[in-house]
């Protein structure tokens, strides 16, 4: 059992013990909500059991709903921890002023998880989860970074590199999103495009059509790709020919050299540490 699975269970149980059980609801409803909270917390485990690694075959509505609820439970857990920490820190003061109350189970009329604060925390968690999902699903904004490189040859001054990372193409992002990312990247008119891993969340049999828009990425000196950990789970060897057909130059502990106005520029790419889990070559910067 992984650490993530154990911690997810802890989150769910914390929400149950600190929010659901102390409430004034009847026991059948408490049981239903407790199981629901635990299922939401264990979203990653349930996804793997039902839909396989990374949920490549999960329908988009299920992916969105489960992701939203998992995030909400996670945020609710953090809010409850913050609240309980505040109660513990202020306990000496409240005790000295006669305002103390039991941290866990108190009298029926003084349960800390009931009433206004419980409703407020749940509502805040749902709202923050919704905001986070909206931000995650929008086309990412362009972030421009100007680098000062001492001794840079004049021929390379102003060389423009567009970096794409963690696209995680899968059931969550639709075709419009993928097309917009490509269009926005091309509009920058980069000299070189580098894709630094975690392009896909699934196998080619499921996602080859979804990654097709990446073939429209255009740069004067081409598109270079180095894998991330998410390429290894579904099978990196299956994805390599797909990436190459999309026009990407794949670098795995390798380098390639381009000439910019007659000046050589070496581009190196390494594998991900996840390769070691599959008996493949791990990252080797010296070799690259």
Where are these regions (language model features)?
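Soluble catalytic domains of enzymes that build or remodel membrane lipids, polysaccharides, and related
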Residues: 143, 148-288
